[in-house]
Amino acid sequence: PPKDDKKKKDAGKSAKKDKDPVNKSGGKAKKKKWSKGKVRDKLNNLVLFDKATYDKLCKEVPNYKLITPAVVSERLKIRGSLARAALQELLSKGLIKLVSKHRAQVIYTRNTKGGDAPAAGEDA
């Protein structure tokens, strides 16, 4: 009987030894929690011009150094499509100058006082 008792203890020890290396090597890692996504505040941009915004467009925008639909949309709180149309109008009136036209990005600048100087020093 005593010999059997020893064997049982050894069996218990060997089982414990088998479990230990698993815990040392990896162990159970904590499960990654989903982060709460950042909530952006809703942009309530104008779809059509009101008088005040239109006046602001005509006065201030031609003085910006870099004029793009994105910049105008952000500053005047108007939709991007409205900003594009407005800049086309300013261009046709000759208040701003086209720098680069791409299907996705149009860049204008203010009219330089000394005629058409090359617009190389552009702040992007």
UniProtKB/Swiss-Prot annotation:
It comes from the Eukaryota. Its main location: cytoplasm. GO terms for molecular function: structural constituent of ribosome. Residues 27-37 have a biased composition (Basic residues). InterPro entries: Ribosomal_eS25, WH-like_DNA-bd_sf. It is found in: Cytoplasm. Transmembrane segments: none annotated. Gene3D superfamilies: Winged helix-like DNA-binding domain superfamily/Winged helix DNA-binding domain. Residues 1-37 are annotated as: Disordered. GO terms for cellular component: cytosolic ribosome; cytosolic small ribosomal subunit; nucleolus; postsynaptic density. The keyword Cytoplasm applies. The modification N6-acetyllysine is found at K42, K51, K59, K65, K93. Residues 1-22 have a biased composition (Basic and acidic residues). Keywords: Acetylation, Cytoplasm, Ribonucleoprotein, Ribosomal protein. The modification N6-succinyllysine is found at K51, K93. Component of the small ribosomal subunit. The ribosome is a large ribonucleoprotein complex responsible for the synthesis of proteins in the cell. Belongs to the eukaryotic ribosomal protein eS25 family. This is Small ribosomal subunit protein eS25. It comes from Oryctolagus cuniculus.
